[in-house]
């Protein structure tokens, strides 16, 4: 390799490292150009990430999916679905902070909510819907009366923070489990689209 080529390659590589972090945000490109839909999620261990991708599949892939930790710019999207993993009846702090900071911009765009919660392996009841949506996400966004769904989640010890894992393992007979179902997430995506007709 000649010095000139080496120098050019080195400059390009250095330039690539200086690109803004947002350019590498977790964005799933839809099957159509100019997507009008976005899903914004907050997750601790990845369950809500998977639920978001599966919801987008149920919406025929016309959705871009964003992790709130990437601090995405959602201004170009017409419709937004918001959701996240739940611990002690709340979503991750990053999602709460984002929704609070962008409440005015998002309120009229939100078209659905979802929550992923292990719920101690118990069936979901109206109590969870009231706690997660009416008492939490709706208060953060101001958007109410929208399609909402609570999905049972999963526990993977290796993905949990040590203190949370220790607390969860202190419950009798608590073991790893996975109750998140792709078919339920996809059906909810279809429900959101149907509500727009």
Locations of regions flagged by a protein language model:
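A short, aliphatic-rich alpha-helical micro-motif
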Residues: 74-75, 106
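N-terminal export signals
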Residues: 4-26
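A short, well-structured beta->alpha microelement
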Residues: 61-72
């Amino acid at each position: 390799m000649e010095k000139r080529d080496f120098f050019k390659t080195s400059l390009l590589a250095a330039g690539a490292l200086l690109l803004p972090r947002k350019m590498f945000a977790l964005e799933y490109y839809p099957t159509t150009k100019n997507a009008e839909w976005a899903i914004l999620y907050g997750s601790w261990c990845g369950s809500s990430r998977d639920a978001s991708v599966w919801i987008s599949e149920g919406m025929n892939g016309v959705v871009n999916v964003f992790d709130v930790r990437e601090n995405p710019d959602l201004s170009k999207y017409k419709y937004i679905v918001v959701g996240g993993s739940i611990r002690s009846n709340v979503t991750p702090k990053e999602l709460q902070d984002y929704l609070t900071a962008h409440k005015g911009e998002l309120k009229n765009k939100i078209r659905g909510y979802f929550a992923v919660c292990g719920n101690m392996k118990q069936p979901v009841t109206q109590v969870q819907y009231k706690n997660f949506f009416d008492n939490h996400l709706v208060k953060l966004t101001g958007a109410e009366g929208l399609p909402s769904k609570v999905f049972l989640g999963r526990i993977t010890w290796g993905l949990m923070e040590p203190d949370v894992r220790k607390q969860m393992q202190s419950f009798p007979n608590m073991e790893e489990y996975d109750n998140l179902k792709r078919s339920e997430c996809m059906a909810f995506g279809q429900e959101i689209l149907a509500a727009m007709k």
